[in-house]
Amino acid sequence: MAGSISCHHGERATEPENPGNVDDNKETGDEKPDGEAGAGNDVVILFTNDLHSQIEPIGKDATYNPDKGGVARIKVLVDSVRAAEKAVIVADAGDFVQGTYYFTCLGGDVEMMVQKEIGYDVRTIGNHEFDKKIPGLKHMLSLNEVTTVSSNYDFSRTVLSNEVKESAIIEAGGHKIGFIGLGVRLSGLVAPNACEDVDYSLPLNKADKIAKELKDNGAEMVIALSHLGYNSDVTFPYYDSGVAAQTENIDFIIGGHTHTFMMKEQYVENEAGNAVPIVQTGSKGIYLGYMKIHLDKVGKQRFSYRLIPVDSRLDSRIDPAFASKLAYYSEKLEQSMSEVLGYCSSTLRKGSPQGTLGNWATDSMVEMCEDVFGVTPDLAVCNNGGLRAEISNGDVTRSDIYAVFPFDNKMTLLELTGTSLLKFFDSMAVNTEPLSAGVRLVIKDGAVKSVSVGGKAIDPKAKYKICTIDYLVESGRYSLDENTSRQDSAEYIYDLFCDHVKKITARGGSLQADIDDRVTVL
């Protein structure tokens, strides 16, 4: 990389989740280049991360960022920049899929078409790219010719050995830009059977070595597409800041995974004394990342970065041919997804240590367990990370339920000893997940002060029936893998919840939940 960027501290990134409504932007959507159009030494990188299958704009009634995002709008911006600049590369930092019924029902076909039509050049693999397991990921990657880089996941023992590259050099406007891909640790995050035979290496064991090889092979700079997540602690090697600080051949990091809205780049000084900018767009395509780099004399004044809002100001310029392709898929799903299943009396939301959505979900799982397995469990638990949307007040459609529960999880009935159940609650005191109403858990200073199930203290020698999801068992979390017996449902959890909502409606009820005393933090 010619020259270096002077080190300074950018503005602090916003919170990774629920950032609130993005500010309205008065631009017209004609994204003009910074400086002279088509300057020969300029390269523009446009990027996304954590799109999570947000094909359509976020709903107009959503609590956060209503009517923001939408891939047709992103294409307007990309086309506009390409028309103004000679050297443009479009990249994605992982989790392009999973989060709406498009992926749940169609397995990535829509998202891969989107990447092809927008013209993505390079991408890396996030944890949710594994959600349809290795055969599903192979199917997705075969649907377009976007270069896939993953430097610390070794796919050589899988059917993806030819589809995923350790690194790549992308040429744009006569310049050679190197790309590496860095992925988060899979253990405990991705079910073992979803990433079978994928070998993980610590990012620092691969990143700098591969970046240097790219430069030795002619790359003028190296950009890491990272799905590690942002954390300001430069001593921690599992996040972007730590990787930047403990390497010397990575020049820029485009991040993901933590859904961090970084309105200003964050600079970290690397081992060579140069400042490495770290950037990230947040999630769901609310913004398109724009980064322009001047390759002749790279310094703070010649590096520019901003997040371009993806909103309704772009609607008049949407490509009709692309819109038609999107409509093909939406119409394919509309009839089943628009089915009204029931009514929600008041909006159900996630929360900690309790939320109305989690309380409703786990209380429902107790009843659903009776329907599926013929057994009333002692308690139910799900994970906050598996609840991907709120349920708004009003009619509840199949698409609403699929938005909350998009994963191909099965309902699971376990039997645990009281000893294992006590260990489970020790974990809940540190990382509280939604629990059903029969639990009374009191937490103080990150530890269990008291706990009971069904109004009784837990007997270490007794056995307890737990209703949960297969993901929590297979990920090895919370001692659930210590079960003495296990049954899995035949149907996926989202279909079971749809049936349950219909059952609530049939008996004249509605979706509702309150915050109660099942979990108390002193």
Name the predicted role of every residue range.
Residues G3-A39:
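Bacterial Sec-dependent N-terminal signal peptides
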Residues H8-H9, D34-D311, T356-L357, A361-E367, ...:
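Acidic, metal/ion-coordinating pockets
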Residues A39-V44, Q54, A62-P66, R73, ...:
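Feature captures C-terminal
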Residues L189-P192, S312-A321, D459, Y478:
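A short, polar/proline- and glycine-enriched secondary-structure boundary/capping micro-motif
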Residues S304-R317, G454-K456:
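Short, solvent-exposed aromatic-acidic interface loops
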Residues D311-V396:
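Hard-cation-handling environments
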